[in-house]
């Protein structure tokens, strides 16, 4: 790929000059709701943001994007902020998409790529959704937010709340990765550890709404995180010169990114910017330790049953019950994709394989996608020449306990054993 985004000095994006949002829409039953009031869910299920795509097509061409800064806000016509909105940003967006020839050769794929979201401001893809959610929350008059999180969303919420000047409350399982706990507290959030799962944290946030007066920004409990996450797909299309890959492997917990990308691809198709008959096959990847979406997909169900006793070192996909389960399953089926569960016991190996062959700091969530790539090639549902993109949702450095290795030591006073060094330890 040509270098399309040279180095630049970051400036906050210009104030939005137009908004093409028409309404919000229930993902469950299609009910329309007004867009410019504070909304959460409809019948306890998520909302879509809908746009006047015809007007966007008249106002924007692909070529106009070329002169804009390489952040997710370059797609402002396809995003919800109103004219005059103050954007809450740390420069998020345009993460690199990296060719992985050696890793691809190992798993049997000739055209494997990793889109490395670990390079975003908070070290994870959560930067996108929380930048958008906090922008819209502030625009709509919120001054206090709360979130239940398995880890990474807590740090991102804290960072963007600090950037926005909002008060943040973060609730996470007590066994969440230590880095996630400390980064959220460092950014000034009120952090509480719960001796349970993310669902238990969610119950606390729900019960505290009236007493504490906070607005919940958890996965799919408000409509705007999807819009931030969909920019992963808009970027990918632009980075591949509007020729989308054949397969996207996505580590799936709450599924906001998968849902958002599929929405974005369909919006691009309606604009005529990508081929509507060549959209990617979306693959939701989970661990055998927590795979409610896989079970529902295989059963042909619209909704997933809660997964009992989930256990996985990939904390970001330890989600036993996803609010948007039916939206995930719909995207998989519409795209001709699938849901797969890979062996929990191999996650560390897949992390190391990606890092040692390509130098990419792959977290345990993305590591499951390395396993899925190999399985897809072996089983034939990914062709050897298919263009395949793995989303690396967060840096391995977020998980020091998962990365831990027993390293060989050298006694400074002993003779140096060069044979041992040559053998690698």
Predicted stretch roles:
Residues 5-425:
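PLP-dependent amino-acid enzyme catalytic core
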């Amino acid at each position: 790929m040509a270098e399309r985004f040279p180095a630049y000095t970051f400036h906050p994006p210009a104030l939005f000059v137009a908004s093409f949002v028409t309404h919000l829409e229930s993902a469950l039953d299609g009910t329309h709701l007004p867009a410019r009031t504070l909304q959460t869910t409809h019948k306890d299920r998520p909302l879509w943001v809908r746009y006047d795509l015809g007007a966007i097509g008249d106002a924007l061409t692909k070529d106009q994007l070329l002169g804009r800064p390489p952040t997710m806000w370059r797609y402002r016509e396809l995003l919800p902020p109103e004219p005059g909105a103050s954007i809450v940003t740390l420069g998020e967006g345009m993460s690199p998409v990296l060719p992985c020839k050696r890793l691809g050769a190992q798993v049997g794929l000739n055209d494997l790529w990793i889109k490395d979201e670990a390079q975003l401001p908070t070290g994870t893809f959560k930067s996108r959704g929380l930048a958008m959610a906090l922008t819209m929350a502030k625009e709509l008059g919120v001054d206090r937010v709360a979130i239940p999180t398995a880890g990474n969303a807590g740090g991102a919420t804290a960072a963007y709340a600090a950037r926005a000047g909002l008060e943040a409350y973060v609730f996470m399982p007590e066994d969440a990765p230590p880095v996630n706990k400390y980064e959220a507290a460092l950014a000034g959030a009120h952090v509480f550890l719960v001796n349970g799962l993310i669902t238990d944290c969610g119950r606390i946030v729900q019960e505290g709404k009236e007493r504490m007066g906070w607005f919940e920004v958890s996965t799919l409990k408000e409509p705007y995180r999807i819009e931030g996450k969909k920019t992963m797909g808009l970027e990918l299309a632009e980075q591949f010169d509007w020729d989308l890959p054949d397969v996207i492997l996505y580590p799936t917990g709450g599924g906001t990114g998968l849902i958002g990308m599929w929405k974005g691809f369909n919006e691009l198709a309606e604009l005529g910017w990508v081929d509507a008959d060549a959209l990617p096959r979306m693959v939701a990847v989970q661990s055998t330790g927590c795979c409610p979406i896989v079970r529902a997909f295989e059963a042909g169900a619209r909704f997933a049953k809660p997964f009992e006793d989930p256990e996985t070192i990939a904390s970001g996909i330890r989600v036993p019950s996803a609010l948007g389960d039916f939206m995930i399953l719909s995207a998989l089926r519409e795209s001709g994709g699938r849901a797969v569960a890979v062996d929990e016991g191999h996650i560390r190996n897949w992390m190391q394989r990606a890092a040692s062959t390509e130098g990419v700091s792959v977290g345990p969530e993305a590591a499951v996608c390395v396993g899925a790539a190999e399985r897809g090639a072996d089983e034939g549902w990914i062709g050897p020449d298919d263009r395949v993109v793995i989303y690396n949702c967060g840096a391995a450095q977020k998980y020091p306990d998962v990365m831990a290795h027993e390293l060989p030591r050298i006694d400074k006073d002993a003779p140096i054993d060069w044979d041992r060094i040559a053998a690698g330890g």
